[in-house]
Swiss-Prot record:
Protein name: Cyclin-B2-1
Species per Swiss-Prot/TrEMBL record: Oryza sativa subsp. indica
Other comments on record: May be involved in rapid internodal growth of deepwater rice under submergence.
Stretches with biased composition (Basic and acidic residues): 49-60
PROSITE patterns: CYCLINS
Record function comment: Involved in the control of the cell cycle at the G2/M (mitosis) transition. May activate CDKB2-1 kinase.
């Protein structure tokens, strides 16, 4: 296409021009705005001839070219640049991919990488078998090394002391036989009511477990008539609050919560009697002390914590659970909760190390807890179930119980290995 025909097409845009002949000798277009008579866009191309004439260097920063025209010369330069870049990239790739030191693999030989791949399956199996051994070396206190309240330097000595002294918090599993006017069913009604009172006052977990411990230790040593059984429970909670809580409920609130069945004076008199009977010994290891440690060893989340405490509080109501030590109750609660959530028997080497119990030792107690879990919503004593059916406690009571533990039979611990592999 000649220049005249090009000028004839471009002249149709914008204002009419005087004539084709007048534009025949003009220089090739550098800016299409020159054609329509509008002021040219600020661009480096428009200013370049001025810089060449003046011979001075431009002091201002270069303007961004936002409306550069696509002329034939400019398009050709872009095409040449792309071809050169492509040739350079191909050459670089050839240099990188070429390894002059590496010889081709002769026929009948196998590369070392291929041989290692064939043995990966066996290595993976060995690693799975050694998982439990590696877990026994896990340091569960390393994350709290900078926390002075965690007392990581003395935590093992503390729990050694708790295990040595947990017998002090235990009672005879048949102490109710010495009571003439009350029985184990009345005790269950009292504990279920105390759990509701504890929830109503929004007290700490430590307070509840210490309250139940005070009640059992006092009833073991003191014969109590039926009419004063609730008084013993209210006073035990008052003592536990004084030992554990920052803000203690006033005695008048306890009078109201018991429907004014007792006076303030009666509560204070019972407080003296309990303290003298127990010789002011309020510092005893409860299941709560061990529960926190075992949950940490199990690397628990919020769901496991709530379900473990739900199962443990169900055990507080049951008189038959007094035959177990506090540490075993806590370990069995965590074990049962893990089984309910994972749907298989799970008890790691780390949990065994810190609890001092194996899965076989926990199985008997765990089966009883599964039965309590299954029947928690039925009957008259449903205080724990209602408490853990709320959103505040994660609706833990609605979790399906680990019924397969009841079906495992006497060889349950041997079955555990097969269930772990299935999981």
């Amino acid at each position: 296409m000649d220049r005249a025909s090009e000028n004839r097409r471009l002249a149709a845009v914008g204002k009419p021009v005087p004539g084709i002949g007048e534009m025949g000798n003009r220089r090739p277009l550098r800016d299409i705005n020159n054609l329509v008579g509008a002021p040219p866009h600020p661009s480096a191309i428009a200013k370049k001839p001025m810089l060449e004439k003046s011979g001075k260097e431009e002091q201002k920063p270069a303007l961004v070219v936002s409306h550069r025209p696509m002329t034939r010369n400019f398009a050709a330069s872009l095409t040449r640049k792309e071809q050169l870049d492509h040739q350079v990239s191909v050459a670089d790739a050839a240099v990188v991919c070429t390894d002059p030191q590496k010889n081709p693999i002769p026929d009948g030989t196998v590369d070392d990488d291929v041989e290692s791949c064939e043995s990966n399956d066996y290595i993976a199996v060995d690693e799975c078998n050694d998982t439990d051994e590696d877990e026994s070396m896990m340091d569960i206190d390393s994350a709290d090394s900078g926390n002075p309240l965690a007392a990581t330097e003395y935590v093992e000595e503390l729990y050694k002391f708790y295990r040595e002294n947990e017998e002090m918090s235990c009672v005879q599993p048949d102490y109710m036989s010495s009571q003439g006017d009350i029985n184990e069913k009345m005790r269950a009604i009292l504990i279920d009511w105390l759990i509701e009172v504890h929830h109503k006052f929004e007290l700490m977990d430590e307070t509840l477990f210490l309250t139940v411990n005070i009640v059992d230790r006092f009833l073991e040593k003191q014969v109590v008539p039926r009419k004063k059984l609730q008084l013993v429970g209210v006073t035990a909670m008052l003592l536990a609050c004084k030992y554990e809580e920052v803000a203690v409920p006033v005695v008048e609130d306890l009078v109201l919560i018991s429907d004014r069945a007792y006076t303030k004076g009666q509560i204070l008199e019972m407080e003296k009697l309990i303290l003298n009977t127990l010789q002011f010994n309020m510092s005893v290891p409860t299941p709560y002390v061990f529960m926190r440690r075992f949950l940490k060893a199990a690397q628990s989340d919020k769901q496991l914590q709530l379900l473990s405490f739900f199962i443990l509080e169900l055990s507080l109501v049951e008189y038959q659970m007094l035959k177990y030590r506090p540490s075993l109750l806590a370990a069995a609660a965590v074990y049962t909760a893990q089984c309910a959530l994972t749907r298989c028997q799970q008890w790691t080497k780390t949990c065994e190390l810190h609890s001092r119990y194996t899965g076989e030792q926990l199985l008997e107690c765990s089966r009883m807890m599964v039965d309590f879990h299954q029947k928690a919503g039925a009957g008259k004593l449903t205080g724990v179930h209602r408490k853990y059916s709320t959103f505040k406690f994660g609706c833990a009571a609605k979790t399906e119980p680990a019924l397969f533990l009841l079906e495992s039979g006497a060889g349950g611990y041997n079955l555990q290995k097969h269930l772990q592999q299935a999981c």
